[in-house]
């Protein structure tokens, strides 16, 4: 069975084509701005402009035609309304034109589900990106959120800090590079609130300290990372302890950070459990994860009518009954 997936929840438009066992194509185009941030209307215009050429590229890369595709999947939410609507409209049009079944996929669930292509069975997932920070796992037939950010996503916090330091966007790789040269830990507010996280306090204090001119930016970058990532690992470890799961996966754009990977790996080794990070092109927002999750859903008996494909900007993971595992 071949599934085509369209991702477009935020600034990345991605189209993926997969089978149960392999990725045939996974192409994307990301809207970038010098100052960072995403305007929903601009994201929608970007997606609308690039959908046809990107679809053509995906089909060529996979070596298939639309007639060969068995299923259309799309990111139904959560995300930016205008961007989601462009993707949903395109998915509906393809499904109707080529008489294919259609499935709407929860973007956050897809980030975790794609790891199952690599043999992961039942993990606790730490999903970290610009707008999202969640610890989630399957419990009682649904993906439960065991902890999440109460304010801003870790990726947005890092990018905002980088902007304040004047080192540009995207900030993640630049902060990581600076942090490697850090020699001294500077105390910052800890980001754990029960099982949830808050990054506004650590961000505000790091910026305040930077503006005093008394601290090296390398030390501030190092301290920011250590403080924020320690909180992420702590909440993930608590979820592991609560659920008794024996696998941890790291997904989302911030999964590119080597220090975060290292800290999670140490935690997993200490607990005697497995740790896995997918290849980066399957960590970031991408169409292949949407296609793969849609395929698993369809195989498990999930069916959508066209009227079921309305986008959901605030689509919670626990709204989805997982009947396909």
Swiss-Prot record:
GO MF, one annotated term: iron ion binding
Positions in coiled-coil regions: none
Keywords recorded for this protein, A-Z: Acyltransferase, Cytoplasm, Iron, Metal-binding, Transferase, tRNA processing
Biological processes, Gene Ontology terms: tRNA threonylcarbamoyladenosine modification
Residues engaged in binding Fe cation: 107, 111, 127, 285
Matching NCBIfam families: arch_KAE1, gcp_kae1, PRK09605.1
PANTHER family: TRNA N6-ADENOSINE THREONYLCARBAMOYLTRANSFERASE (PTHR11735:SF14)
Protein name in the entry: tRNA N6-adenosine threonylcarbamoyltransferase
